Amino acid sequence: MSNKKMLTVLLVSLLAIRLGAQDSIPSFVKDSLDVYTNRALQQWQLPGAAVCIIKNGRVVLMKGYGLKEMNGTDKVDENTLFMIGSNSKAFTATALAMLDNEKKLSLDDKVTKWIPEFKLDNTAAGEQAIIRDLLCHRLGFQTFQGDFTYWTSNLSRREVIEKMSHIKAMYPFRTNWGYTNAAFLTAGEIIPKVTGMQWEDFIKEKIFVPLGMNNTLALSKDYPAANNKCEPHTIYNGKLVKIPYCQIDNLAPAGSISSSVNDMSKWVMMQLNNGKLDGKQIIPSQAIAQTRRPHSILGDGGHIFNKGHFALYGLGWFLEEYSGRKIVSHTGGVNGFVTSVTLVPEENLGIIVFTNTDQNSFYEALKWEILDAYLGNPYRNYSQVYLGFASSQNNSEAKKDKALQDSVALHPATSLPLAAYTGHYFNNLYGDMNVVMENSELRMKFSHHPNMYAKLEALGGNRFYVSFSDPIFSKAVFPFKVENGKVTGVTVKVADFVEYNPYEFVKK
């Protein structure tokens, strides 16, 4: 054989070996993922999940696990809809980056150029804020600050934007990262100012349709009518319960999209191919790059098994280093669902995990398990590790809750007659709340959540054990303030899943 022929054979052999290595499926994915997932469904009281893995432009795995609804019979498949929550944010950021690329706006435009009524409590910050500030969470708010006021409320989008001016920012402008859903709403509301199209119409026409995401819904109001969909669930009093659909179209650009892993695989393939799908440029590569440019510093990227070196936020994406690779990802959580979408551009790898409870860490555990499998890291059994954390926390909370219920059962005396706590209360951000006697119970009724109430049971003195009619808002202890024998106010705190900050209501 001539040297030239031998060299050709050698090159072809090396190429075949390289391609085979590129397309090889890790043993965890090939042999263990199904067992791992089905076991996790039981351990996490998780009715159903859907998973998709994309490698080198091809779908390696795409399937559903478990059931759409607890105690049901319909199985999750690759076309079953889940509400994807804050994974909607990357769509909003991408839409605005597209408009920036088309020179129809600049991401450095001041927000007030497009929404003159936009204001913040810090007047100068409101005047100086640019579109990028909205998309990278650097307005100065604490994470989730203000969300109780907005979340599943009857406020309009315009009213949500107006309410932002009443929030006392926790940090100076642009000094700290704080996850702000209302900021993404504001960014999304710039789109109709520029294009004449509502946010939901723009992303459908410019993103969903070109990608062939024909099963994807932009608004939560359309979810209940979908045929192939999951029901929302949570864990309440240690048990799995079905909960109402989440209506958050007043925050739509921050989190109202519903999709399937099949549809989302097209979004992920396009992202991994710098805006192209099936050879066609759907999103300009410059717009994709804009969203992955670091804007906010979160920390050093610490991980339970792997010390990271940075954790940042782009525009609608978290950016971090893991095992020497740049990870582009986001998670999403709305009532009854938690989801994750992960890109590893250097490995041409994409991972999608959707689940239909909002009280599980499996959606993140499986992501890390798949990442480790493809990156050659040892198997960690993240689900078991996270279960340990969750079990410890749940046991602690259950003990505290039982102690509170035991106290209620003793019928301790309140400092004042129950009628003294009734009346009209006001918070400058939230607005109006009333405490009333109804069905022989003391209840709180919130003006912007007319379908929800909080039941108050005496713990003695001026403290009350509170349980919300909507399990998402959880349970708490509310202390009333009393001066000179009169009730002057109350501190209201909902579940951290909704907001970390307490609200001080003053009695009128």
Each model region followed by its residue ranges:
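Bacterial Sec-dependent N-terminal signal peptides
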Residues: 1-24
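Residue-level micro-sites within transmembrane alpha helices that shape
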Residues: 3-4, 17, 88, 136, ...
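A broadly conserved amphipathic alpha-helix scaffold signal in soluble, globular proteins
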Residues: 11, 15, 136, 188-192, ...
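Short glycine-rich, polar/acidic loop-and-turn segments at beta strand-coil junctions
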Residues: 13, 53-55, 65-67, 88
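Catalytic loop of the DD-peptidase/beta-lactamase superfamily, centered on the K-T-G motif
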Residues: 22-63, 192-205, 209, 235, ...
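Active-site-proximal loop and beta-strand segments within enzyme catalytic domains
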Residues: 28, 38, 43, 67-181, ...
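Short acidic alpha-helix initiation/capping motifs at coil-to-helix transition points
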Residues: 181-182, 362
